[in-house]
Amino acid sequence: MTKSNETERMEESEETHSSDIRSASESDHASGSDHTESADEIPTADAEQGELEQLEKLKDDLARERAAFHNFRMARAKQAEIERDRTRSEVIRVILPVLDDFARIEKHSTLDDPFKAVVTKLRSAMEKIGLTAFGNPGDPFNPELHEALFQNPSPDVQTETVQDVIEAGYCLGETVIRAAKVVVQVPNG
């Protein structure tokens, strides 16, 4: 073989060898690419799991915030109701002396018809907002509802009893606005 033939053969052999190497490399690269895709899928699954956990945490946070806001609204509504009752009580306390004066006039004399109509309307208006009077002669004495101004010993009673009402007591719903001022009969003894 001549040198040139030998050189050509070597070059062909090298080209074939290079071609085989490229082919193998491409084949490895292709199979590596498949391997890389499955490796990419694993982080994607982990990422999805992380996103799901984060989403669950956000849902929990949202539920807590909603509950906190609901509790805030309920507390605010209750506070507003307490404030309304307090304001209503203050207004009623200002009007009570007028009702007391009318009650005294009725007790000791008669009201003219126009004044009687005004008193009736005023009492009706107070009842509409929930104001009720209490304290009648013969009622058992209750220190939570009655303020004893005088005590009269009496053999006729077994327990402390309201003998006379000086000023009626008033309740707004369940709340005592003013205790009734009374004279109490107490058992002798």
Curated annotation (Swiss-Prot):
Subcellular localization, as worded in the UniProt entry: Cytoplasm
Biased composition annotated in UniProt, kind: Basic and acidic residues: 1-38
InterPro entries linked: GrpE, GrpE_coiled_coil, GrpE_head
CDD domains reported in the protein's UniProt record: GrpE (cd00446)
GO molecular function, one term: protein homodimerization activity
PROSITE patterns: GRPE
One GO location term (cellular component): cytoplasm
Recorded superkingdom: Bacteria
Family: Belongs to the GrpE family.
Subunit structure: Homodimer.
Protein's name in the database: Protein GrpE
Taxonomic source organism: Tropheryma whipplei (strain Twist)
Gene behind this protein: grpE
